[in-house]
Amino acid sequence: MSTLEAVAAPPAPSSAPPSTESKPDVSSISPESLTPLSSLLAELQLEQVVKTLWRATNHEPARFHLSPSHCVVEAAGNKQQTLKLSWGDVLGAHVLTADGELVQTPVDVQNDAKFLLGVFACVCKNHKPKTLKKRRVEEFFFRFKGEQMQQVLKLQKIINFVADPRNQEIVEKLESLDQLEIVERPQRKFLVLVNPVSGPGRAQQVYETKVAPMLRFANVETEVKIMDHANHAMEVVLEIPLGVYDCVVAVGGDGSLYEIVQGLMKRADWNDAIRQPIGIIPGGSGNGLAHSIAHQSEEKGKPVNAAFILAKGLPHDLDITSVRNGKETTYSFLSLEWASIADVDIGSEKLRMLGGLRFTVAFINQLVFQRPEYPGKIWYLDESEVGNPPHYFETHDPKSTDRPTMDLFDGEGQGPPADSQPEDGKEDEAKEEKADKSGIWKELDGHFRIVWVMNVSHAASDALIAPGAEFDDGYNYITFMDGAHSRKDLLAMMLAIETGDHMDKKGVQQVRTRAFKLVPERSTDLMCVDGEVVEGPYLEAQVHRGLARIMAVPRWQSKE
């Protein structure tokens, strides 16, 4: 068995117990025995395993140097080389037998027996400023004799502690790792919900080949469940115990995560459940939230980058928008769509096998053959003179199980007028109609070609609709084009959304708001929330800042 196979075996079937890695018994290593680090590193005699061009293996003497910012290895061979890894890229370390089997218990170790210390990282090479990071997994192996097993296990424990993102704040405060005191933490555990039919149908393969190995390298225990029917993910999270999983991961598209959010909000203990950290591996057609998280961390929206974010991430606040139609309330993390984009989103469902290409095909059909304009009204709350919105639990009791209120609509003196008529000749203008204690309600009235409301930056992998949006800023971003502009203008907008340059195109407007009301004139118009059809006759929406939590990469500080 190769070292890669030993550490990154495929996950167990969903019916099997949670998969766990065999690990050395290091419980007997006390914090005192781990210091000073410099003395430990000076005693170690390691040889780096180097593959040559002819697939032969060389073993060159190597020495570790660890700082609060980097793991440095100096190899003294014919060509002296230095390996420098940022802790922000290091996943973890494992001790292996010479055959690549994980060492289970360091007992009866023969002094002359050969073992390997494996260090695993997800590195970004040749990254240029203002570009997204492309990553790949790299493995580094160091041979040692059994007589040094205890010292290597100490080094392994230090590497895993410093590489664990939960310890970033501790490590960053140190001038030297000689000052490090190990704080015992439970192993991270993720619940992984795989939707095998999401998008082009490769979600399970993506997880097994690209994600599972990285989580194992990072010492994350996983429990994998394969979703086999509609709303399965919702059913799972309705029943999961809280406080058990460090993250609930959806492997699929935005629809998979939509089920998880609805399930958490349906629980009687929703106020605690919605704080369960969630994560996403892009395996669907749109993958808007995955790309929004990656974009904010300057990462590409690929599965490897998403797995890196899970392995090295920490929970960060995520805005949730309550959307109601007078009959029911749904909870959105991504977007609300009306007019041509809603027809494209829903009309392309039958083209799922095309992946992201489905939206392009459907849009061309919409532009050429379908109705061009959609009459209706949009009311939005303009708070340009008001400061940043508060986080939800700053103004609401975290222990209360009362559902999130839409106080910007329902409070005394709040909300847009219940029944308003546009002034003559002013149908396409925004008008100050009503001021309340939160700001000014303004109306957009007329015909629209597209209305796209974003909670985050990306609606899909190739749709950067709200370049300035962050997933915890407390705002929705309404991007629209009115009916006074041509199909050519709409086409120019859509051709530019991949880079966000559509904001400079003719007729494109965007407003930022915490609350809005959408009223289509035609009852047959489609409206979508996070890609799911929602009935009218109207939709009211209000953002709850930081209500949920999503895994995102922290900003690692460099100390040279």
Model-predicted segments: where are they?
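Generic C-terminus detector
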Residues: 148-152, 156, 514, 518-560
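Conserved beta-strand elements of beta-rich interaction domains across eukaryotes
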Residues: 71-72, 78, 124-126, 197-199, ...
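Short conserved micro-motifs at the rims of enzyme active sites and ligand-binding pockets
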Residues: 345, 390, 462-466, 489-492, ...
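Catalytic core of DAGKc-family lipid kinases
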Residues: 217, 227-229, 235, 242, ...
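Short polybasic amphipathic segments
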Residues: 42, 52, 69-74, 115-120, ...
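ATP/NTP phosphate-donor binding region
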Residues: 2-251, 258, 262-265
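Non-catalytic interaction/regulatory modules that flank or connect domains
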Residues: 115, 442-450, 459-469, 482
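Catalytic phosphate-donor-binding core of small-molecule kinases
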Residues: 310-313, 363-382, 426-429, 458, ...
